A protein has these predicted regions:
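Acidic, metal-associated active-site segment
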Residues: 97-113
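Acidic catalytic patch
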Residues: 70-93
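Phosphate- and divalent-cation-binding pockets in alpha/beta enzyme and binding domains
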Residues: 49-50, 86, 124-125
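Short beta-strand scaffold positions
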Residues: 42, 98, 116-117
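Short, well-structured N-terminal submotif of metal-dependent ribonuclease cores
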Residues: 1-42, 52-66, 142-143
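Short active-site oxyanion
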Residues: 36-39, 72-74, 108-113
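Acidic, PIN/NYN-like endoribonuclease modules and their adjacent C-terminal/linker elements
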Residues: 2-4, 108-143
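Alpha-helix capping/helix-boundary segments
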Residues: 15-16, 46, 102-103, 120-122
C-alpha cells in the first residue's frame, strides 16, 4: 500500500453550483475522484456562492452536504482575521467576487490547483496572485 496522497483539488463556485443543481455527470466524476483517493477542497464561501446561485432549489443544500460528506472532501472555512485579510487582498488584486476569491486565496497559499468548468474566468485573476494557481478545466464530465 502506498503512502502517496494526491495534491488536493480546490473546487470553484461554478463546480459547486453545478453540484447544487444536481448535475449527475459532474457528481459522478467527483465520486470517481473520491473513490480514487483524490482530496477535494470545498471553500466554505464558494459553497455559499453555489447555494446563492441555486437558491430556491430544494435539493441544493443536501447535494452540497453530500459532497462534503465524501471520504476525501474537506470543507475549508474562513478562519479568523488573518484569513479574512488574505481574502480581502485576494479580492482587491484579482477582481474576483468573495466566493471565488476564497478558492483563489486557498490556492495561493496552498499551491493546489483549482478545478473549474470555466478556465477562462481564471486566466486574468491568476496572474495577479503571488503563486498563480494551476487551473484544471472540466470540459466534459462524461469523459
Amino acid at each position: 500500500m502506498s503512502d502517496f496522497t494526491p495534491t488536493p483539488y480546490i473546487l470553484d463556485t461554478g463546480v459547486l453550483a453545478d453540484v447544487a443543481r444536481g448535475d449527475a455527470d459532474l457528481i459522478g466524476l467527483l465520486q470517481d475522484f473520491d473513490r480514487a483517493g483524490q482530496p477535494l477542497i470545498i471553500p466554505a464561501l464558494a459553497a455559499t456562492g453555489a447555494l446563492l446561485d441555486g437558491r430556491g432549489s430544494p435539493d441544493a443544500q443536501a447535494l452540497l452536504a453530500g459532497l462534503a460528506a465524501f471520504e476525501h472532501a474537506i470543507v475549508a472555512p474562513l478562519d479568523g482575521v488573518t484569513q479574512s485579510a488574505k481574502l480581502t487582498d485576494t479580492m482587491a488584486v484579482t477582481g474576483l467576487d468573495v466566493y471565488d476569491a476564497h478558492a483563489a486565496a486557498i490556492a495561493d497559499v496552498s499551491i493546489c490547483p483549482i478545478l473549474t468548468l470555466h478556465a477562462e474566468k481564471w486566466r486574468q485573476p491568476s496572474r495577479a496572485l503571488d503563486n498563480p494557481p494551476h487551473i484544471i478545466e472540466i470540459t466534459d464530465p462524461d469523459q
